[in-house]
Swiss-Prot record:
Family of this protein: Belongs to the ribonuclease III family.
Positions of transmembrane segments: none
Active site feature: D63, E135
Encoding gene (name): rnc
GO biological process terms held by the UniProt record: mRNA processing; regulation of gene expression; rRNA processing; tRNA processing
Protein name (Swiss-Prot/TrEMBL): Ribonuclease 3
Naturally occurring in which organism (per UniProt): Nitrosomonas europaea (strain ATCC 19718 / CIP 103999 / KCTC 2705 / NBRC 14298)
Length: 245
């Protein structure tokens, strides 16, 4: 999906700041995307205090695109999480606080286009304005290049955050991650117990339960050894602990 629509500009309420210079170049590098139609980005960075057109419609679109992309990312990355936990985890990644942090990392505050009153009142630091701008930029990328491209941009931006929750890419095994997480919150360590060992001695499958009384979490893992089964149970427990607590 691409867009080549003309963008009208309100000449009555012009903002003298232009999208160029070092801040702009650094922003594009961090974003990992260069607009073929710079006016799309300008509108995505234009707050309603500057007049019309502004970024509210782009924000509306970007909100839906972001939710879809993050939902897909979490669905693929955490195959054992149930729907409710995926929903809570997604909310942690797309809420205003998370988007504000992302906007700050991208340097959007230096580029946002504001009306005089909003600018004087510190609007370029306001979390809601910056969070909305992130969604608007995502909407603009979607309009210009379609979902496949904007999804790649979103995944690249969120990958460092997702990696922190993913035992497979953290460099530590699941039991260690779970133990460290619980210790940091002064929660009693998990209890592991073998529920069942099936099969011949040379080809057994172990079923292990992991219980965290302090969090009310109970998970089960299986593997060809007790250790592997414990690791699988710990992985599931860690994911649940991160999402719920």
């Amino acid at each position: 999906m691409t867009s080549s629509r003309p963008i009208a500009h309100n000449t009555k309420n012009k903002q003298t700041k232009t999208l160029k210079g070092r801040d702009y170049a650094v922003f594009l590098q961090k974003l990992g995307y260069t607009f073929k139609q710079p006016d799309l980005l300008r509108e995505a960075l234009t707050h309603r205090s500057l007049g019309f057109p502004n970024n509210e419609r782009f924000e509306f679109l970007g909100d839906s695109v972001l939710n879809c992309a993050v939902s897909t990312l979490l669905f693929k990355r955490f195959p054992s999480l149930p729907e409710g936990d995926l929903t809570r985890l997604r909310a942690n990644f797309v809420n205003q606080q998370a988007l504000h942090r992302l906007a700050s990392a991208l340097g959007i505050g230096e580029l946002i286009l504001l009306g005089e009153g909003e600018r004087k009142s510190g609007g370029h630091h306001r979390p809601s304005i910056l969070a909305n701008a992130v969604e608007a930029i995502i909407g603009a990328i979607y309009l210009e290049s379609g979902f496949a491209v904007v999804e790649q941009v979103i995944v690249a931006l969120y990958e460092p955050l997702i990696r922190q929750l993913d035992p497979d890419t953290s460099g530590k095994d699941s039991k260690t991650l779970l133990q460290e997480y619980l210790q940091s919150r002064k929660i009693a360590l998990p209890e592991y117990s073998v529920l069942l060992a099936q099969g011949d001695p040379h080809a057994q499958v172990f079923h292990v339960e992991c219980v965290i009384p302090g969090f009310g979490i109970r998970t089960r893992g299986e593997g060809t050894s007790r250790r592997r089964a414990e690791q699988e149970a710990a992985r599931q427990a860690y994911e649940l602990a991160i999402v719920r607590h």
